[in-house]
Amino acid sequence: MQQHPDQLKLEEEPYLKGTVNTVIYHNDTNLYTVLKVKVTETSEAIEDKAVSVTGYFPALQEEETYTFYGKIVTHPKFGLQFQAEHFKKEIPTTKEGIIQYLSSDLFEGIGKKTAEEIVKKLGDSAINKILADASVLYDVPRLSKKKADTLAGALQRHQGLEQIMISLNQFGFGPQLSMKIYQAYESETLEKIQENPYQLVKDVEGIGFGKADELGSRMGLSGNHPERVKAAILYTLETTCLSEGHTYIETEQLIIDTQSLLNQSAREGQRITEMDAANAIIALGENKDIVIEDGRCYFPSLFYAEQNVAKRVKHIASQTEYENQFPESEFLLALGELEERMDVQYAPSQKEAIQKALSSPMLLLTGGPGTGKTTVIRGIVELYGELHGVSLDPSAYKKDEAFPIVLAAPTGRAAKRMSESTGLPAVTIHRLLGWNGAEGFTHTEDQPIEGKLLIIDEASMLDIWLANHLFKAIPDHIQIIIVGDEDQLPSVGPGQVLRDLLASQVIPTVRLTDIYRQAEGSSIVELAHQMKNGLLPNNLTAPTKDRSFIRCGGSQIKEVVEKVVANALKKGYTAKDIQVLAPMYRGKAGINELNVMLQDILNPPKEKRRELKFGDVVYRTGDKILQLVNQPENNVFNGDIGEITSIFYAKENTEKEDMAVVSFDGNEMTFTKKDFNQFTHAYCCSIHKSQGSEFPIVVLPVVKGYYRMLRRNLLYTAITRAKKFLILCGEEEALEWGVKNNDATVRQTSLKNRLSVQVEEMDAELEALQKELPFSVHDANIGMEGITPFDFMKEEQQ
């Protein structure tokens, strides 16, 4: 009998057959599994009777027999292991084995007695008979037709998994990604892929256009196949919006970019024409995969996020109940008493900001460093309590009684700064909205947030997705104050919410321009405002009491930074006080190399200092680390800085995994070693990651090797992180070039224009579009609930 080619391939692979004694570990999310297997047969030189088998599997059953295909590896701590790429379930052939198999947790509703009846009726070949014809079960006592069909279907799925995994492996998918694909499609996996391999991009996290296109090519799909062109358009739209911060792309530009992508590797001379791309865009629009409006193409989540934010902002801003709420004489009297009590003298623009904040439904407060934004926020809070006769002591309120003033910011560190400056509780926006993981946000339009006054700080970091969720959850009766510096870097995610709100001129706005910290002798603030205008001081290299410039070339940066940090340590500063910032990761002056050097200075190895190696990186207790992945459910966000407080080795815990405990300002999280890619060292970090934070000492290398990244708003953001001291090191020419370079990408957004449209017109437009769509526009993130910018971006995995 001729063997199937796949079977020949399997027999050539190293294998291990055995019974699963124990499932040591199984991750329900990524399916990573560690098993202890009693070996009955193997192609390898394995002397142990029981071996650890690792791989990505569904929930395998203890006491069941499987054949694993892969290779022997030696783990540095756990010794010899069999690393499985795929596996197959051995069909039991004895009556006892079949009864145990059918009555296992794999088959819901089949108990031992029913399994015994099946074996009694069908004999030792029961499983093969059921796989061949499900109707053989219909005459089995104790088994209804519905249960019989369910059992037969489950058997087909479990037995089919073996062939599916083999095929996916041949398609070039690794075991982890193969399991993700199987989870998405189950028994229909191969049919779905054959039907349209590009559907994988939409349905399976971790598969990008490149991987799907490689598969499409292997399957013989033509270069101008409609599904390929549509997938390329979605990929281009997604990656451009995420990398450039746009909420849309002009249709003409989208066609050009798609042609450029696909024609780089045209198949068999099949080039994509403008008409091919245009037809695909029309088809995507008709299928509601994108929204086309006035020559612009949007993802639905971005289109409706902008629509909803504009509608809510205009509605809230139109409230009139706060006008003339307090007579001017009463306001001025209370303000004067506040100035005396707090020993502060408010400037005219600051008084205007406080008065508008208390008499408007919404206020935008903007200004650069040192202009008194924090002073104004503190004044608003104090005067609100005074004029409304409410206590500002959180302990005076009962557990179920809402505190009237709500303070929030996009990141944990920004919220902490807000709390420190006001003396009141402050939270992240995700915490305010009640993020609860996969279920999304607790607070929505149906269950709005509580309070009377809401102040949002660091609003330049607010992207359109989060802004949409925020404004949906704000009830009409809450006054809103939005604070931020429009000259800082925009949000990581799409949109430019603060800039668009300011440009729309539909919301009362106060711009603080007078610099107060400069009067206190802060040359850092003076430098920031000069940079904002494209200028540098004549005395740039002359040392001041809070700023210095050290000339050096790119090859000398590590040595200079090392000396600066060592000197700061001698003066009593700690790793928490010192922050090195750089715009690039690679190179001698890059973040990666600087972190290695800084760790050796700030947290060197010691005899009792525990450490773990992850790839080429060593982590130690006491290390300063930077979170890279949003985990709103744990109140930890991309950009948060923490400290490794404990390290536990695998032999010391029941999970049998190396672990690190990280404290983010008292909020502790435990990471298993395989999740160490969620953070990195924070002795040196990117300027983007530092946004929303302040540090006593900032060390900023600026060299010509950074030229691709040097821009005015980047440098402006970097130097405004320094609270007490700023040490610039590098080349004057590089700094001058960066300050003159104001060519930051102009984000393409529609929020400003939508804010100028009347609410009635917007309602009519939304209603017309809703009739064409298969879902409710009130859920702006259909299919993407709770998604962050990083969740939205799919990266290819092997």
UniProtKB/Swiss-Prot annotation:
SUPFAM superfamilies: P-loop containing nucleoside triphosphate hydrolases. Its main location: cytoplasm. The keyword Transport does not apply. ATP binds at G370, T371, G372, K373, T374. It is an enzyme of class 5 (isomerase). InterPro entries: AAA+_ATPase, Coronavir_polyprotein_1ab, P-loop_NTPase, RecD2, RecD2-like_HHH, RecD2_N_OB, RecD2_SH13, UvrD-like_helicase_C. GO terms for molecular function: 5'-3' DNA helicase activity; ATP binding; ATP hydrolysis activity; DNA binding; single-stranded DNA helicase activity. Its EC number is 5.6.2.3. Disruption phenotype: Replication forks collapse more frequently. A modest (2.8- to 3.6-fold) increase in spontaneous mutation; the mutations observed are not consistent with a mismatch repair defect. Increased sensitivity to mitomycin C (blocks replication by adding bulky N2 adducts), single- and double-stranded breaks generated by phleomycin, alkylating agent methyl methane sulfonate (MMS) and UV damage. Increased sensitivity to MMS. Increased sensitivity to H2O2. RecD2 is synthetically lethal with recG and with ruvAB. RecA threads persist for a longer time after induction of DNA damage. Keywords: ATP-binding, Cytoplasm, DNA-binding, Helicase, Hydrolase, Isomerase, Nucleotide-binding. One of its GO terms (biological process) is DNA recombination. It catalyses: Couples ATP hydrolysis with the unwinding of duplex DNA at the replication fork by translocating in the 5'-3' direction. This creates two antiparallel DNA single strands (ssDNA). The leading ssDNA polymer is the template for DNA polymerase III holoenzyme which synthesizes a continuous strand; ATP + H2O = ADP + phosphate + H(+). Signal peptide: none annotated. Belongs to the RecD family. RecD2 subfamily. Interacts with SSB (sbbA). There are no RecB or RecC proteins in this organism. This is ATP-dependent RecD2 DNA helicase. It comes from Bacillus subtilis (strain 168).
